[in-house]
Amino acid sequence: MTKCIGFSILFSLGIFSLTTAQKIAIVDIGYVLDNMSEYTNAQTELDKIAETWQQEISVEQDKVKSMYNKYQAELVLLSEEMKQQKENEIIAKEKEIRELQKSKFGPEGELFQKRQSLVSPIQEKVYGAIQEYATERGYDIILDKGGSSGILFTNERYDKTDDVLRALKN
């Protein structure tokens, strides 16, 4: 009988510890950012820069079209050597435009770098506020509603990375 009562108490304590819920919150990062004047100003500045660069590229593309149209009009009058020279000029200009596009809009281009310099400090400010909010109010996990950022905050006690590494090493 004593064993049965002892087992019941242990079982109840085990169930109680399993049922302690984690405090979870959801934050819509996109909504937060869209409602920050700093962020919208940065986006406006980035849009203006991108538009200016796109116009520059369009001007250069128009030049290539003009070069090609002129080449087509003169084609019957050109020697083989001149044809080759004109074709090479057009190809070189097209390559120059692609390089310009890449330098401005590529993955490591000027627009990406400008976005990093303008937006990253704002994002860090938001993530800092989320960390502070979660810590002060005892949240264990905070998720991004939009899903683009995934987990925004997690209590360190739920990080089992080292446990998994130890298990793999054994």
Give the predicted meaning of each segment:
Residues 1-24:
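Bacterial Sec-dependent N-terminal signal peptides
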Residues 22-170:
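Amphipathic, charged alpha-helical segments and their helix-to-coil junctions
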